[in-house]
């Protein structure tokens, strides 16, 4: 029994140092104070307006502890009908960081839609690198 206690202590000590891999099954990046997904930006507007557009409090949809905001009722209805299409890939984590083995929340202002899927990035140059070779990042993430 002492061995297992020692092993548990060692694992507890090194666990935070191990890189964390996120997958598409990870929760959506959410503001811990407001509960808003992707900082309240409208995920549908990236597709319909080709723009990062702040959602409005009167057009919200909630589920699984996450609140999504939308620019209008039409965008809210589209998202509710097809969240798998409009929700950010990798839960909104930056795929270029996932390739390096770390999770870093994407910034909704740095984005790209490729292959009819939304990807968020934490830096502009990460978005540019991804856009230049999306296949590489998607196979490695």
Residue ranges, per PLM feature:
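Charged, low-complexity intrinsically disordered segments
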Residues: 15-141
């Amino acid at each position: 029994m002492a061995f297992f206690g020692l092993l548990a202590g060692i694992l507890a000590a090194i666990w935070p140092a191990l890189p964390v891999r996120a997958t598409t099954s990870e929760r959506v990046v959410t503001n811990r104070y407001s509960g808003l997904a992707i900082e309240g930006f409208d995920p549908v507007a990236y597709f319909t307006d080709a723009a990062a557009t702040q959602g409005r409090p009167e057009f919200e949809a909630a589920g699984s502890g996450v609140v999504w905001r939308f620019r209008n009722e039409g965008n809210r209805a589209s998202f509710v009908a097809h969240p798998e299409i409009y929700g950010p890939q990798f839960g909104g984590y930056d795929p270029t960081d996932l390739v390096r083995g770390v999770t870093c929340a994407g910034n909704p202002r740095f984005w790209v839609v490729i292959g009819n899927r939304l990807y968020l990035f934490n830096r502009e140059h990460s978005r540019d690198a991804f856009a230049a070779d999306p296949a590489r990042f998607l196979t490695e993430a």
